[in-house]
Amino acid sequence: MSKVIGIDLGTTNSCVAVMDGKDVRVIENAEGARTTPSQVAFTESGERLVGQPAKRQAVTNPENTLFAIKRLIGRRYSDPTVEKDKGLVPYRIVKGDNGDAWVQTRDEKYAPSQLSAFILQKMKETAEAHLGEPVTQAVITVPAYFNDSQRQATKDAGKIAGLEVLRIINEPTAAALAYGMDKKNTGTIAVFDLGGGTFDVSVLEIGDGVFEVKSTNGDTFLGGEDFDARIIDYLASEFKKEQGIDLRTDRLALQRLKEAAEKAKIELSSSMQTEVNLPFITADQAGPKHLNIKLTRAKLEALVDDLVQRTVEPCRKALADAGIKASEIDEVILVGGMTRMPKVQQVVKDFFGREPHKGVNPDEVVAMGAAIQGGVLKGDVKDVLLLDVTPLSLGIETLGGVFTRLIDRNTTIPTRKSQTFSTAEDSQTAVTIRVFQGEREMAADNKMLGQFDLVGLPSAPRGVPQIEVTFDIDANGIVNVSAKDKATGKEQAIRIQASGGLSDNDIERMVKEAELNAEADRKRKEAVEARNHADGLIHATEKNLKEYGDKIPAEDKAKVEGDLTALKAVLDSEDAESIKAKTDALMQSAMKLGEAAYSAGQSAEGAPHAAGAEASAQSRTDDGVVDADFEEVDEKKGH
């Protein structure tokens, strides 16, 4: 039975884990790292890079290196946060055909779900390489404060990546699961999760294998990216004061500033001062300009103070919704890379009145929790029950544009709730049900999830028809809504798909594209491996030709030279089969050279060493396995 993997699809980095017996193992990627940058890049040659290779070339290809895509997922192009994001990133955010925020790179437009799928594919491949078997099922985490559109878009990303998403689980809940699995103690914990792009705080009660979320709150547009933006802004302003040049208008310089800002931020978590040094950042008529600015921890804390303080109000609301005081929290768990910042830790300590727990790895704990939930769903992990909540209230628009709640925030899910409504006008034969999610009193101020019509109502005075509206939230936090006319039994139901969102046809097309790309990637990898092998053979053959070419018949030498030229001609192609065929041909013809080299070695070293020469030749060809000389020892001696 194949394993279920747990994936933390992060704004800045992603991580994958799997249950290994009773333990959870975080899986290293092909580059040997336990986390993978959530970045996708498209090169000039049309190659797609994901993870570390994408991040490495970002400075030279800023417009086509896409990062922090999670902040766009499930959002409309008209969303104010998208407008804000457009000023922070060097790539182009455009309006998708469905009205959602998409990304334009080179000549293609991509949905955030599609780009997230490329990252999920990388995590899937990482797990498959480690496990040695195909992986088809996953539990994927999302910020607790993600709305329905964002959850649905994340699930779509999993499908495009070729994964059956068994469950969408909230990040703080996953972290609590990983933290509390081995602990026998019971109590109330708060999970403070400040990552690369989002902030969540959840209050949970843990006891006897039951993890019950009491409340959750957060901000889906607050994280490390915002801290980086403040540093970038400061560096650019200081440079403009000194040199009169605004680096913010130069995409290449902006990307270098971003890398430097991230590095400085990390360094200032452990040191009091750092120096940002970027030679040749720009140039004018007078020549090249260099950026060299000292940044202290105190200055950084002043720059981001309001961002750190923004985490306090959600904490206050989460405690109020849970009906407890800060002093009643037994443990505060820090999750997300930004919680390494001393200022953040101090604010947490001041608010909760206790030192936060630092015993979990903030970058890996969420993926570990997702893997545990995968084990629970598979039946491999027993006696664990997870009770999560819906982060935002759900309801419909009623007369006067009022938002009428059917399900309040922090209601345990899965849940189902019905309420009866009526018509607003005489002889009304159809009603439009408009579904919203949020906490404001007027529907228009909340997030509209979708709408549908219930038609064919019998003509009657206003207030007479009885229309029952039912909300159903599944364990993923995804909403289904139905409306039924009690008199006729007519019913209309929808799985909420935001007025934007991807249609089934879109998803199907993207799944096919992903499969085609996977095949293209496999062929590209085969070509690279074939090229590497051919390169080594060309080098060895040319060396042997110089040394031993005159020791073989002229026609054999001509054959080797011909095959060598033929292999060089196809070396730069992407046709792995052609490279392999020409490599095999050269290997065959070059055997004569090998024999000449062997004979020369034999005559030079003398017959007694011939066997040794053969052994050494053998040791070099057997896939890098080195044969060692050994001496047989008579065990009876010396005992």
UniProtKB/Swiss-Prot annotation:
Organism, scientific name: Rhodospirillum rubrum (strain ATCC 11170 / ATH 1.1.1 / DSM 467 / LMG 4362 / NCIMB 8255 / S1)
Keyword Glycoprotein applies: no
Molecular function terms, GO-annotated: ATP binding; ATP-dependent protein folding chaperone; unfolded protein binding
SUPFAM superfamilies in the cross-refs: Actin-like ATPase domain (SSF53067), Heat shock protein 70kD (HSP70), C-terminal subdomain (SSF100934), Heat shock protein 70kD (HSP70), peptide-binding domain (SSF100920)
Feature: compositional bias, Acidic residues: 624-633
Bias (Low complexity) ranges: 603-617
Domain of life per record: Bacteria
Entry keyword Nucleotide-binding: yes
UniProt protein name: Chaperone protein DnaK
PANTHER family: HEAT SHOCK PROTEIN 70KDA
InterPro entries: ATPase_NBD, Chaperone_DnaK, Heat_shock_70_CS, HSP70_C_sf, HSP70_peptide-bd_sf, Hsp_70_fam
Family stated for the protein in its record: Belongs to the heat shock protein 70 family.
UniProt induction comment: By stress conditions e.g. heat shock.
Residue(s) carrying Phosphothreonine: T198
